Amino acid sequence: MLDSSVPTFSVTTPLYYVNDVPHLGSAYTTVVADTLARFKRLQGYDVLMITGTDEHGQKIQRTAEAQELDPQTHCDRTVVKFKELWRSLNILYDRFSRTTDPRHLAIVKDFFQRVWDKGDIYLAQQQGWYCVACEEFKEKRDLLEDNHCPLHPNRKAEWRDEENYFFRLSRYQHPLEELYAQRPEFIQPSSRRNEVLNFVAQGLQDFSISRVNLDWGFPLPNDPNHTIYVWFDALLGYVTALLDEDEEPNLTNALVKWWPINLHLIGKDILRFHAVYWPAMLMSAELAIPAQVFGHGFLTKDGQKMGKSLGNTVDPLDLINRYGEDAFRYYFLKEIEFGKDGDFNEQRFVNVLNADLANDLGNLLNRTLGMVKKYCQGQGPQVMATDLAPDNPLKALGSHLGEEVSSAYERLSFTDACEAIFTLVRAGNKYIDDMAPWKLFKQGSQKEVEDVLYSVLESIRLSAYLLSPIVPRLSTKIYQQLGFTWDFDQWRSPLEQAEEFNRHQSWGQLGANQNLPPAQPIFTKLELPAEE
């Protein structure tokens, strides 16, 4: 059971579609979720991070058939690749939700019955253009020339004329508008909120929640000739994930501890499902609405949309194997303003990592530890933070940095968090150059030497701590080189974490005479692979 005295935080990635291996966008969203979960754990929250896979639907059935596999085997193999990528990225998720899990069927049935009993499901004829890749009917006005889908321009939408069960989305037009008005923070960023408001203002139409002639999916509880539509099934995967392993799978058990979710992180391509369909479904079942849906932008490569047909897709595992997981995590969170579209360029990737992590941070730590060994007999400076002059520039910058960076993490402004931290790192480099401790040492000014070196080491410590949600292994290396027995992948109780956070996000936690191990490089300079 959760301790009611401990604050809680729950965050989800999308349940990724397993028609193909995980791509760069999947890795991006998951790194963001993991970073935020790590930050909330640092603060002392009891955290639940949910990721997983959406495994039903026609697209998956056809993909499996093309490989001469049954759909379950295809799903099982693809799930292994997702989990392998999450391990490579050092993702510490709490639950991995699979929509083929038998327990998920129990949740879907339970939820369906509630909505059925409410009178919000009915049988009717559906005619229209259907995109298999989107698993969605499209309005004719939204299609490209020759009925191609705008999101999948290489694929034609298929004309369908079939009997389906529908959800009365139109009944929730006014309740949704009230939700958006009363809770403006529900959809973020504001550009996504405006997209949804414009869509809803055009008038909501009921949407089908079943398909005929589809074997791969859960049968409709009241009509086994129909298969439940993938989104009416997949969105409930967030609820199934809330069940403890030994709990009987029903809605009551699933919702008692962690519902409603604090934050759904998604790509903007599935915004409508999460910000319109999902809250309407929950209203119908008389369940609480999640606190926020945040739709981030798309990733491009060298300014171009990525696609197999263009031959410019980026395998995230290749990037990680070449440069390391912390390099991957840092680049995408620092360089791409979360919520907006962003670009990946490998030369810029290498340049940013070398400038920030190898040069500014890594070299600062190495040169400072080298001076400590030379000028302080290898022991940490015999200085406490309280011994420093009130006008010490690094102390002035560091004294409010924890609050500034915490605020940036709360706003999902990871770029701002990194910029604030590296303002202190760059100031540390400038301070050493300006104060020239090698000259002070020659002048016999030992106290001034130790003041300078302590100030810089404490700036590095504070920077590493505040960077740890983004680059946990790099931060662990730095903390250990500063004499702490610390691992940012290990967690204590929320109360202990809260106490540590209050101390370590503040300036002045490095002790006097800290026992410092020999300096070692923390981040090796990156190089582009040689052209073949």
Curated annotation (Swiss-Prot):
Keywords: Aminoacyl-tRNA synthetase, ATP-binding, Cytoplasm, Ligase, Metal-binding, Nucleotide-binding, Protein biosynthesis, Zinc. GO terms for biological process: methionyl-tRNA aminoacylation. Binds 1 zinc ion per subunit. Its main location: cytoplasm. Disulfide bonds: none annotated. A motif ('KMSKS' region) lies at residues 305-309. Zn(2+) binds at residues 131, 134, 149, 152. InterPro entries: Anticodon_Met, Met-tRNA_synth, Met-tRNA_synth_2, Methionyl/Leucyl_tRNA_Synth, MetRS_core, Rossmann-like_a/b/a_fold, tRNA-synt_1_cat_dom, tRNAsynth_Ia_anticodon-bd. Transmembrane segments: none annotated. Monomer. Belongs to the class-I aminoacyl-tRNA synthetase family. MetG type 2A subfamily. This is Methionine--tRNA ligase. It comes from Synechocystis sp. (strain ATCC 27184 / PCC 6803 / Kazusa).
